[in-house]
Swiss-Prot record:
It comes from Lens culinaris (Lentil). Binds two manganese (or other transition metal) ions and two calcium ions per heterotetramer. The metal ions are essential for the saccharide-binding activity. It comes from the Eukaryota. InterPro entries: ConA-like_dom_sf, L-lectin, Lectin_LegA_CS, Lectin_legB_Mn/Ca_BS, Legume_lectin_dom, Leguminous_Lectin. Heterotetramer of two alpha and two beta chains. This is Lectin. D-glucose binds at residues 111, 129, 246-247.
């Protein structure tokens, strides 16, 4: 009898060991994904959180109208698991969107349009040159924010000395860690792809004007920078857009948006249907 009990205990211990090993293997080797695609914005776009002057109309996301001193933001409603505390793994992601900046005058345009990654409880920050995302030109690790800015107005306190419009990568500060001069094509649709490679920590930004009529101008731009996301942003984040105007202004519109991320070593998946 004792021998049978011993055998049963041994069996259950072996079974428990195999079960725990299987669960651990599944957790380590599975991938958590988040995906969504918005090809046309609806008036009651339920998977967006609007802040400030942001709203949807006529199939577009409007962040600002061409009026002075406005801030408009829109966030994806579901938080994104951008890195995993248990495994230390960081997500690969790619997001693509089309946007238009349309100003009454091509010479007097302001201020900024940006895609950003921020804490889940993010709120609109200082407007004007601060994107509605930051409050200071100084590095502030408590900001926990990464932004890709499309800057149409020169701010001497932090912008590149060449005074050109530019694409910038911002890490916890409005002062970009890297920039690329950019020729705004007023009223033209721009296609943007932003990709993050978790193996190299390289964030890559590409902007193209597919329908440009300005043949003499550069119509494609690429910018890269090493951004250690795990050291900058929280484990769970929100992603979204922000745009601002000041004394000068422009309408800032997003016409489509898609996002896909993959985080290894977790065990859940979130998929959002096309909207």
């Amino acid at each position: 009898m004792a021998s049978l009990q011993t055998q049963m205990i041994s069996f259950y211990l072996i079974f428990l060991s195999i079960l725990l090993t299987t669960i651990f293997f599944f957790k380590v080797n599975s991938t958590e994904t988040t995906s969504f695609s918005i090809t046309k914005f609806s008036p009651d776009q339920k998977n967006l959180i609007f802040q400030g002057d942001g709203y949807t109309t006529k199939g577009k996301l409007t962040l600002t109208k061409a009026v002075k001193s406005t801030v408009g933001r829109a966030l994806y409603s579901t938080p994104i698991h951008i890195w995993d505390r248990d495994t230390g793994n960081v997500a690969n992601f790619v997001t693509s969107f089309t946007f238009v900046i349309d100003a009454p005058s091509s010479y007097n345009v302001a201020d900024e349009f940006t895609f950003f990654i921020a804490p889940v409880d993010t709120k609109p920050q200082t407007g004007g040159g601060y994107l509605g995302v930051f409050n200071s030109k100084e590095y502030d690790k408590t900001s926990q924010t990464v932004a890709v800015e499309f800057d149409t107005f020169y701010n001497a306190a932090w912008d590149p000395s060449n005074k050109e419009r530019h694409i910038g990568i911002d890490v916890n500060s409005i002062k970009s860690v890297n920039t690329k001069s950019w020729n705004l094509q007023n009223g033209e649709r721009a296609n943007v792809v932003i990709a993050f490679n978790a193996a190299t920590n390289v964030l890559t930004v590409t902007l193209t004007y597919p329908n440009s009529l300005e043949e003499e101008n550069v119509t494609s731009y690429t910018l890269n920078e090493v951004v250690p996301l795990k050291d900058v942003v929280p484990e769970w984040v929100r992603i979204g857009f922000s745009a601002t105007t000041g004394a000068e202004f422009a309408a800032h519109e997003v016409h489509s948006w898609s996002f896909h991320s993959e985080l290894g070593g977790t065990s859940s998946s979130k998929q959002a249907a096309d909207a």
